[in-house]
């Protein structure tokens, strides 16, 4: 908002969000597959998904998710010992702090799914990759983030009573696998007019 008003800045960020989401997913898939076409396709699906399209109607904090694939990329590189401990801890800490500032919901979801993925791979790939080192370094990063975010946690705890009881309807902002094939209300051309 230094150069433009809030509305213009918001619109620019809404235009950048899908492209940055797609690019981050492209980097992750390109690293995993070494196939540019597959990475392009996956980046497109991630960056311009119905989830992003529906949240661009008013939830920029939920539509801006490029840090999620970047956190996963950093974790995979650490598990494969392609990045040092200090670099991993510092990078993951910065990414988590940024994601906390953007959206705590996305961070909590990423942490939960990351833990499920970790335990899945721990039992299937623990001999081929450094799962214990990844867990230790992630724990150190989590402690660092907790210390740095302790003032925010304090005020979140104080404001817990002010959370409204009602939950928004999932009709508009819901996500399902059919959304890629059958357009939802938010992705259908013309929206509610048709």
Located regions from the model:
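Juxtamembrane segments of multi-pass membrane glycosylation machinery
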Residues: 1-13
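Membrane-embedded helix bundles of polyisoprenyl
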Residues: 15, 19-32, 37-123, 137-151
């Amino acid at each position: 908002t230094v150069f433009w008003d809030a509305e213009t800045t918001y619109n620019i960020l809404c235009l950048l969000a899908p492209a940055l989401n797609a690019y981050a997913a492209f980097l992750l898939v390109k690293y995993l597959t070494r196939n540019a076409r597959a990475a392009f396709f996956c980046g497109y699906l991630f960056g311009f998904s119905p989830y992003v399209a529906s949240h661009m109607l008013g939830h920029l904090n939920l539509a801006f998710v490029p840090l999620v694939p970047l956190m996963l990329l950093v974790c995979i590189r650490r598990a494969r010992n392609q990045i040092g401990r200090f670099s991993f801890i510092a990078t993951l800490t910065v990414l988590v702090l940024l994601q906390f500032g953007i959206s705590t919901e996305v961070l909590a979801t990423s942490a939960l799914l990351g833990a499920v993925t970790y335990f899945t791979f721990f039992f299937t790939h623990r001999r081929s990759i450094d799962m214990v080192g990844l867990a230790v370094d992630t724990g150190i990063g989590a402690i660092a983030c907790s210390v740095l975010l302790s003032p925010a946690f304090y005020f979140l705890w104080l404001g817990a009573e002010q959370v409204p009881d009602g939950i928004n309807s999932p009709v508009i902002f819901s996500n399902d696998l059919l959304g890629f094939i059958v357009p939802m209300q938010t992705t259908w051309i013309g929206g509610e007019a048709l």
